[in-house]
């Protein structure tokens, strides 16, 4: 585990070279096809050296939940173990890790008709009105979900309309816990400035690699928009806004870097409260040896 730009992929590839393991990606951005540059997806050479499972598995127009990830990850883990190898889970989507290790509440699946109904209400009344609705039926969830978080707000309302039970009621029950023993590592630089510099350097490298053209191709499709989870990935939203003429190029670069730093901060907040973690320093020469020592 680790924040974005902390060196997770590089360390994982080295582990695959030294240890009989296979990588399972735990990243909510890498699941999307045709989103390669802005997600820092491992390139062809890296994937040839160390294939990553659960990368490029859905179209950007599709939805993919933490429950979907848990189901798919468990299947991949079972397959890897059946061949006598060790699964190596690598990524920074903490909600996926949490869902995998702790199980999930038995929430209803997505209902497109209900989602369209909620979206239409939001268009007509505004998200604040829908947040007021949620406060009436589920004040606990309303306290946790900001009116400016349409994805979580819509999901809370959808759950209630589909099941007749609130999100708070349903989340009191968890599904099966993780059936395997794990050794958990987190990698990050101890100096936040180092991480900030890495984030800035990487985003500027993405731009040099053609990130703007990548977003242009996605934007040219008629089925993608900024309300989709795929297009809310850091960098993509800001570049889309630049291509729409809402912001200039320099502002786009600044906003994307700031958004990525904020993502890293949230990831680190999760990790600081995570139990039983073995911490690694980004770029340290002994990281590989430390992982090998604790994994025996």
UniProtKB/Swiss-Prot annotation:
Single Gene Ontology MF annotation: ATP binding
Site positions (Interaction with substrate tRNA): 93, 115
UniProt entry tagged with the keyword RNA-binding: no
SUPFAM superfamilies reported for this sequence: P-loop containing nucleoside triphosphate hydrolases (SSF52540)
Pfam families in the record: IPPT
Region span, Interaction with substrate tRNA: 27-30, 151-155, 232-237
Essential cofactor(s): Mg(2+)
HAMAP family: IPP_trans
Name by which UniProt lists this protein: tRNA dimethylallyltransferase
Organism: Shewanella pealeana (strain ATCC 700345 / ANG-SQ1)
């Amino acid at each position: 585990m680790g924040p974005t730009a902390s060196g997770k992929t590089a360390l994982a590839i080295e582990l695959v070279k030294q240890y009989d393991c296979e990588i399972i990606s735990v990243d909510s951005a890498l699941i999307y096809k045709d989103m390669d540059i802005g997600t820092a997806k491992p390139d062809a050479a890296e994937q040839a050296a160390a294939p990553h499972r659960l990368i490029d598995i859905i179209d950007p127009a599709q939805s993919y939940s933490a429950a979907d990830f848990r189901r798919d990850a468990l299947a991949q883990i079972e397959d890897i173990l059946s061949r006598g190898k060790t699964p190596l889970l690598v990524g920074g989507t903490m909600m996926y890790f949490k869902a995998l290790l702790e199980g999930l509440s038995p929430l209803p699946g997505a209902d497109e008709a209900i989602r369209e109904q909620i979206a239409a209400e939001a268009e007509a009344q505004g998200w604040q009105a829908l947040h007021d609705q949620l406060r009436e039926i589920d004040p606990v969830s309303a306290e946790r979900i900001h009116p400016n978080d349409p994805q979580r707000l819509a999901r809370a309302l959808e759950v209630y309309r589909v099941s007749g039970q609130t999100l708070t009621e349903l989340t009191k029950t968890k599904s099966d816990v993780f059936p395997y023993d794990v050794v958990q590592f987190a990698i990050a630089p101890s100096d936040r400035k180092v991480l900030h510099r890495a984030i800035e350097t990487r985003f500027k490298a993405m731009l040099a690699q053609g990130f703007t053209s990548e977003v242009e191709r996605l934007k040219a499709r008629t089925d993608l928009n900024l309300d989709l989870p795929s297009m809310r990935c850091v960098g993509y939203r800001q570049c889309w806004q630049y291509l729409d003429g809402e912001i200039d190029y320099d502002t786009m670069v600044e906003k994307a870097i700031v958004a990525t730093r904020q993502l890293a901060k949230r990831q680190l907040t999760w990790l600081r409260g995570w139990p039983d973690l073995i911490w690694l320093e980004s770029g340290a020469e002994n990281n590989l040896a430390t992982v090998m020592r604790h994994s025996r």
